[in-house]
Amino acid sequence: MDATTRVELGENSYDIAIAKESLQQIGTFLRPLDLGQKVLIVSNPEIYGHYGETVVNSLQAAGFSVDTHLIPAGEQYKNLASIEKIYDTAFKNRLERSSTLLALGGGVIGDMTGFAAATWLRGINFVQVPTTLLAMVDASVGGKTGVNHPQGKNLIGAFYQPKFVLIDPTVLKTLPVREFRAGMAEVIKYGVIWDADLFTKLEAAEQIDSYATIDPDLLDLILERSCRAKAEVVSQDERESGLRAILNYGHTLGHAVESLTHYETFVHGEGVAIGMALAGAIATRMNLWTTAETQRQDALIKKAGLPTECPNNLAIEAILETLQSDKKVKSGKVRFVLPTKIGEVLITDQVSADLITDVLAPALC
């Protein structure tokens, strides 16, 4: 399947191209985009080992001058120290304002590369080439860039849109099963917040927990529909002043769980899965949706091989304190995205600490 989705943001508009075996032609895709002569690829050693040579050869064949900067894999490297090392390489290779940073990797690589691009020389070109399912359907689209702070996830960052996103679904064949499942958390999220038909199709599928077992046509549909959903939301609200906040479904408590486990116990999608299960339980307690809908959501999360329960070694007080550092806090109140039915959510700051405690207590006792 080849498909192109346009993110409409005026002068910052760009295309998301989904095309199998497209890494071999990446130079052809990028050459018409006025991205300057120099390209600095930012990746991690494992991903670069799989696809670096292919990307470099295609870019060089298209006339680009290419250099590389590698960052160790893992959320623990998503920090300002890693950004400074990207700056050092950019300086060493004399990147100019017309030059391009190219993110070849998952969400961590994309977030850091985008932030470096936003801040080096006050902004240079940025291209996303996501290699994980999570990055393909979520992190590579929308222009959120940044790094973590010891006090919370993604507290340092900027909105900075890429010039282009290239998705080659065939690279998922080398993705570890755990990472594929993590990406499915974001896909399920789109089903809950935006696309009830996608949710139903995931329910009806025989298997959705690995690249090897998922129906290829369903995977094509997942990529196209997820990118379209995010593009539609971002086009209406680039800087999260309203509608875009719904994309944070599952992320409020999910980020807290990730942070309190020092980004070592769960990958991001697993945190989101736990956060969605907890948000669903809160919505049920508030009579926003039914117990049956919560059960449908949690069953789909489990079908994807993802966790639904908060680890029992966390203190409720620590979770509540961490929530106060969430980026969505407004006037001192934590804002939650909560489902009202499959395919629709609302944003509310009327979730009390007592209610959160009641929902968390059974899991933490």
UniProtKB/Swiss-Prot annotation:
GO molecular function: 3-dehydroquinate synthase activity; metal ion binding; nucleotide binding
GO biological process: amino acid biosynthetic process; aromatic amino acid family biosynthetic process; chorismate biosynthetic process
Location relative to the cell: Cytoplasm
Binding site for Zn(2+): E186, H251, H268
Presence of the UniProt keyword Zinc in the record: yes
UniProt-listed Gene3D superfamilies: 3.40.50.1970, Dehydroquinate synthase-like - alpha domain
Catalysed reaction, written as an equation: 7-phospho-2-dehydro-3-deoxy-D-arabino-heptonate = 3-dehydroquinate + phosphate
Keywords assigned: Amino-acid biosynthesis, Aromatic amino acid biosynthesis, Cobalt, Cytoplasm, Lyase, Metal-binding, NAD, Nucleotide-binding, Zinc
InterPro entries referenced in this protein's UniProt entry, alphabetically: Dehydroquinate_synthase, DHQ_synth_AroB, DHQ_synth_fam, DHQS/DOIS_N, DHQS_C
Details of cofactor binding: Binds 1 divalent metal cation per subunit. Can use either Co(2+) or Zn(2+).
Cofactor (UniProt): Co(2+); Zn(2+); NAD(+)
Pathway: Metabolic intermediate biosynthesis; chorismate biosynthesis; chorismate from D-erythrose 4-phosphate and phosphoenolpyruvate: step 2/7
E.C. designation(s): 4.2.3.4
Entry binding sites for NAD(+): G107, V108, I109, G110, D111, T131, T132, K144, K153
Group of enzyme by EC: lyase
Gene Ontology CC: one annotated term: cytoplasm
Keyword Nucleotide-binding: yes
Role this protein plays: Catalyzes the conversion of 3-deoxy-D-arabino-heptulosonate 7-phosphate (DAHP) to dehydroquinate (DHQ).
Family statement drawn from the similarity comment of this UniProt entry: Belongs to the sugar phosphate cyclases superfamily. Dehydroquinate synthase family.
Protein's name in the database: 3-dehydroquinate synthase
